[in-house]
Amino acid sequence: MNETQVIINLISADKDAMPDALAGLACSAAIAVSDIPVEALFSEVRVARINGEFVVNPGRAALENADMDFIVAATKNDITMVEGEADECTEAELVAALKIAHEAIKVQIEAQERLAALVGEKALVKRPLPEIPEHEEIKKRIEALASADIYALARSASDKDTRKTRVDEIKDATKAALLEAFGEEVMAEWAATADRYFEKLKKQVIRDVVLSDSLRLDGRKFDQIRPIWCEVDFLPSAHGSSVFTRGETQSLTSLTLGTKQDQALIDTALNPHDDKFILHYNFPPYSTGEVKPMRGPGRREVGHANLAGRSIRKVMPADVPYTVRIVSDILESNGSSSMATVCAGTLALMDGGIQIKAPVAGIAMGAIADDKGRMAILSDILGDEDALGDMDFKVTGTAKGITGTQMDIKIDGMPYEMLEKALIQAREGRLHILGEMAKAIAVPNADLKPHAPRVIEFRIPRDFIGAVIGPGGKIIQEMQRQTGTTISIDEDTDGGIVAIFGPDKASLDAAYGQIQAIVFIPEVGSLFEGVVEELAEYGAFIKFKGKTGLMHVSEYDHRRIENIADVLKVGDPITFKILDVDAKTGKMKLSRRAITAKPDGTMPTDEENAARANRGGGGDRGGDRRGGGGGRDDRRGGGGGGRGGDDRRGGGGGFRGR
């Protein structure tokens, strides 16, 4: 049969529109108006629950408030695909969402049918399918040769490697018998057909064993989960790590905590944004015992990472100051590797001290049905059960409810009752898996790993953002160089949010102190300790908390001092009180006299100090030479580097990419 390719291009869109929910409708409509044969028209919609009400195809702004978000595809009669996420919804709520989506899809399919009718004969009369060549004698001979052996294998409760080896042996023996019976010339012509017959027979026999004997390939019951082994703190240098093994599927997952500079740019057509939660899924060829070239991420890697990531994201705390990166390396695979990634990712987060709301586990469900009305719902499916089955239904969630799901149904006639049964069975399996995970770690560790980066966050006034950054980012970059930290500043309506990332407390304290010195606003009457920075005829310039103020010679003591150099020298420590701060220039008058007893033993009153401050006499040193400290414009040195882009982030480094 010829392949059919439909290419969908987004030409233009309203920024509030969600074009992904319309792609299926466009695809099916294109086929509907062509002469390409199709078993059934389909469509897809997004269904979300917003403020307790289900909405079909909501806009992007409305979707921000949704606690359920699913894309559903279906024909007129049956659901065929589901993918989405939820804030721990129940199984019944998911089924309710599917039913609402299905009703909307039926309307869209009817519109396609009317469109095809308008096109007329070109759309209504489909081209005939080419006949597939058949050879009944070869087909019967394969059934006679291989059926019994395949049946015995299906009942043998074997592992993946043993099963594969035995299938190859049966196939080779069958080929040899066919070659002897029909000769080389015939078999050379019908080799592909013979392979097709063998694969179809294998599928039929194994499916019949499941339905008739209630026996799975590895000997499990329908609702039985494979043995689980998991461990945390597996990698000594990672910020968190875990190994999760379920049967013959294993994920080694690591957690890395980075800075805001490490956020991933999600460059979508309508909603480009930075994401501080990243999950990467790697499926190397050795995980299935194969030799293949290592290329970039394919659909499998992207799709599995997306499903696992959206499932775990639902339990991430909102106040995590780090960029969180989870990497799942599949070491061996025999089905459900994406669900192993969910489990291993959760364990790694808890091992790393990330305070997730609740552990998340995932399970892959399958189904096998026949035209006699028999159906088996299988928990924790194998790779072979996925290939020969009729459904692949991945469900993730906490003990409370569902956080993510992905379902593909390959047959017609999957009633809602069976979907509900699959969801209930999936919940039972999920709870079992969560129990096994709890044996390794039940709650997140209280602290981060010793070698994980530390971070502090605090706010600064909006007027000081430019002063901290400096012209062209000069000040913040020098601060990072001196302290060995990475500093980022984000701006919101309330000012600036500063995040400092460093390897230890000392580096954080050093950077924090420098920033506090810049944003420090001195208050009249406050006591401070400072250091003499420079002497002049009329007084001393004192440095404290990153600021500089003038102590006039008359404010050193109650007795007359002719030369300030007689009592102070550069580098001397000194305690003083701020006598006055000029509201316009920020220049400060400092006084030791204000905190020194008078000759009669009494202390100066606030009124006396205020009177001296108002009289002036502090001496003027040429105005802006020192600027009195605290003037934002002087510190910025004439502006420079604006508030956005790289200057705000102050450089830094870290991982980026897959």
Where are the model-predicted features located?
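Flexible hinge/switch segments at interdomain interfaces of large molecular machines
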Residues: 1-3, 73-75, 143-144, 280-286, ...
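Flexible, glycine/charged-enriched surface loops at secondary-structure junctions
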Residues: 1-4, 39-41, 108-127, 161, ...
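Glycine-rich, flexible beta-strand/loop modules in the N-terminal catalytic cores of phosphate-handling
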Residues: 1-4, 10-12, 17, 76, ...
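Conserved phosphate/anionic-ligand binding catalytic regions in large, soluble enzymes, centered on
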Residues: 17-35, 231-255, 334-354, 466-476
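Mobile "lid/hinge" segments at catalytic clefts and subdomain interfaces of large enzymes
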Residues: 34-158, 349-446
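Long, charged amphipathic helices and adjacent flexible linkers at domain junctions
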Residues: 119-133, 432-458, 505, 509-529
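Extended amphipathic alpha-helical scaffolds
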Residues: 124, 128-271, 456-467, 475, ...
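Single-stranded RNA-binding regions, centering on S1/OB-family and related RNA-binding modules
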Residues: 451-453, 464-658
